[in-house]
Amino acid sequence: MKQLKTQDRDRRDVICQSENQVATYSDILCEKLDEIVYAEHLSPKKGMPDYGTDWEEFVDIKKADMKSLTYDQLLLFLKNIDPKKNGGRLDLLKTFLRGRDIPFKDGLWDWRN
């Protein structure tokens, strides 16, 4: 697991990074000044349909709404999910947050490279 420092983020952890013949995938948790962002990235490989388009499905959580939940606890929760058994991490994260009455924003971005 990598942890990187950048100007607009306090912390960034790559939870999972993989690829197959179709695409590359990465699941990332970032801590910014006032929010925590979980994102799942998908980038199709050359020769595949939609090559050149990347997707990011995300969940944004305001730090002020986190109650007693910490970044490290959220990271541990996400790392302990087996995405193959559970159909991914995103829906389980949303259920986890709703169960604790922690509001969040979610969505899907796509862009052309």
Go through the PLM ranges and name each one.
Residues S43-M48:
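Short, surface-exposed beta-strand-loop junctions and turns on beta-sheet-rich folds
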Residues K5:
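Extended, Lys/Arg-enriched charged tracts that mediate electrostatic binding to polyanionic substrates
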Residues P49-N113:
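Mixed-charge, Lys/Arg-enriched low-complexity segments
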